[in-house]
């Protein structure tokens, strides 16, 4: 995903 709506796409803690 280039710019995911939710940050969970890039940083899933």
From Swiss-Prot:
Principal localization reads other
Q: Which UniProt keywords apply?
A: Endoplasmic reticulum, Microsome
Classify the source by domain of life: Eukaryota
Any one GO CC term of this protein is:
endoplasmic reticulum
Q: What protein is this chain from? A: 13 kDa protein
Q: Which organism is it from?
A: Triakis scyllium (Banded houndshark)
Q: Where in the cell is it found?
A: Microsome; Endoplasmic reticulum
């Amino acid at each position: 995903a280039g710019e995911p709506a939710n940050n969970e796409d890039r940083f899933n803690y």
